[in-house]
């Protein structure tokens, strides 16, 4: 069995995540992270020698949770609800790790070690997303023409991965509210909407939801 994680290390990561989301990756210094965790900088350096090391540890946390949310074995059956739950779960997760998305440009410049990790994770998540589309098609919930499948996949990945940075850059949003999550889910539902089958639309009509994946 592996060595159990240090409680202090986990407390530092918990505090760092809150601070990074609130202040941004650029403004959150190691001194502020240590203060938020209730320790001095010397103790922080015992666990994380650099701010980049904190970023990497939080990315590892996110990766574990993201891959658990989108497992290789996807929901069976012909109901839309499990896929809607995946959608809501994804946006809740990205809100919790907001700094990774909102501050992506700074992170890749300031923490070069993140770049290959982010690329690998992005590729893995793209394949999981491809599997979601395939499962929805097999369940008779969507029908996507072969010629449009890769374009839909790319647009789903762009919206699901960059919605927070769009809000930050275009609208100056730094702190996300439930309304922002609802907006982001709506953008993704709009991409699915043209491809929903009669079966899926009937399920939405029964719940009073508009076309798209029900929130």
Mark where each language-model region is.
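N-terminal positioning helix adjacent to the helix-turn-helix/winged-helix DNA-binding module
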Residues: 8-15, 152
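Hydrophobic/aromatic residues within well-ordered alpha-helical segments
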Residues: 51, 58, 62, 66, ...
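Secondary-structure edge/capping motif, primarily at the C-terminal ends of alpha-helices
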Residues: 70-74, 101-108, 136, 140, ...
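Hydrophobic alpha-helical connector segments
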Residues: 71-99, 153
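Short hydrophobic clusters on alpha-helical segments that form packing/core surfaces
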Residues: 12-20, 66, 90
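Helix-turn-helix
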Residues: 11, 19, 23-53, 57-61
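C-terminal peripheral helix-coil segments that are non-catalytic and often amphipathic
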Residues: 131, 165-215
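Amphipathic alpha-helical packing segments from all-alpha helical-bundle domains
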Residues: 113-139, 150-165, 182-194
